[in-house]
Amino acid sequence: MIMLIDFDYFFAQVEEINDPSLKGKPVVVSVYSGRNERSGAVATSNYEARALGIKSGMPLYRALEIGKNRAVFLPIRKDFYQKYSDKIMDIISEYSEKMEIASIDEAYIDIDGNDCKIGIANEIKNRILNETGIKVSIGIGINKVIAKMAAEMAKPNGIKCISADETGEFLNNIKINDIPGIGKVLSKNLNEIGIEYLRDIKNFDVNKIKSILGESKTNYLYELYENKYFSPVEPRVKKNFGRYLTLPENTRDIDKIVPYLKKSIDAAYEKAPGIPQEISVVAIMEDLDIVSRSYTGNAIKRDDSINIALNLLNKIISEDNRNIRRIGVRLSKISKNNTLDDFF
């Protein structure tokens, strides 16, 4: 199954986090062309602005007309948003070896098995919210296209899974204009000849559809309809390496947690392509809240990591009276140097 994590109205949401006075107000983040103060386009808008009719891609002059004296207009700060994106991508990368960053505010991961893994999706959502303040929506499906459509259905701040068993019926009832990659113009052209739903293509000659879409997009639609579409998640180079294990029962008993902590350490070091300068112990609590403690040093050898991790675990338990559901270790600031001497 493929999971898409989509950061809800990302640019505007970052602005809300950094200026709480914006919360509840229509917020519009725009790209200014520099020609004049009304020239440019809307990069994104929050849901309050969307309720006014201000949407992404709208010419700025039109958005200013709609939002006059009602909306807050801000210039895009992409480098600032990228810092938030990097933090979120690092969190997501811990949940799969196969991860594809689709854009600054979207990432796909390939999750093992054919079930929806709603628990993992909730965990990812909670970690991102707790560690960055950002709300995300998550879509899950058998391929990237279905995962993306599911994510759209999950917005705002939700989770939607189209299981393998539900895929056939879902595809049979999906509208052409809801399919990623087709676009408004081509959807309109297909609608005009009677193709409103994906299932309608079976009633038309393939060459007729090719005359509208071209060969590549026509093949894409047929593969999707016949449930034969596949596009692999393209992995990226990871910055962090971690392993998380679910405990047999929720507990605060260190003796019961330590064996799983050690397994997490061993697995994380096996994945890491070098020596970490930072180690974090991450505890997912019984209510799915996430608590973590970190240690940074010049070079953290595997033999030393267990004592460091135990100290971090003790800090978590002494400072929090909740039971722990899952325990994990995250290694970061990896040096690919071959020897410890290179650190000094």
UniProtKB/Swiss-Prot annotation:
Tell me one GO molecular function of this protein. damaged DNA binding
Per its record, the protein catalyses: DNA(n) + a 2'-deoxyribonucleoside 5'-triphosphate = DNA(n+1) + diphosphate
Q: Which domain of life is it from?
A: Archaea
Q: What region holds the UmuC domain?
A: 2-183
Q: Which cofactor does it need?
A: Mg(2+)
Q: Name one GO cellular component term.
A: cytoplasm
Main subcellular localisation: cytoplasm
Q: Which residues form the active site?
A: 106
Can you say where in the cell this protein is located?
Cytoplasm
This chain's function reads: Poorly processive, error-prone DNA polymerase involved in untargeted mutagenesis. Copies undamaged DNA at stalled replication forks, which arise in vivo from mismatched or misaligned primer ends. These misaligned primers can be extended by PolIV. Exhibits no 3'-5' exonuclease (proofreading) activity. May be involved in translesional synthesis.
- Family matches, as PANTHER family: DNA POLYMERASE KAPPA (PTHR11076:SF33), DNA REPAIR POLYMERASE UMUC / TRANSFERASE FAMILY MEMBER (PTHR11076)
Q: How does it assemble?
A: Monomer.
Tell me the protein's name.
DNA polymerase IV
UniProt organism field: Picrophilus torridus (strain ATCC 700027 / DSM 9790 / JCM 10055 / NBRC 100828 / KAW 2/3)
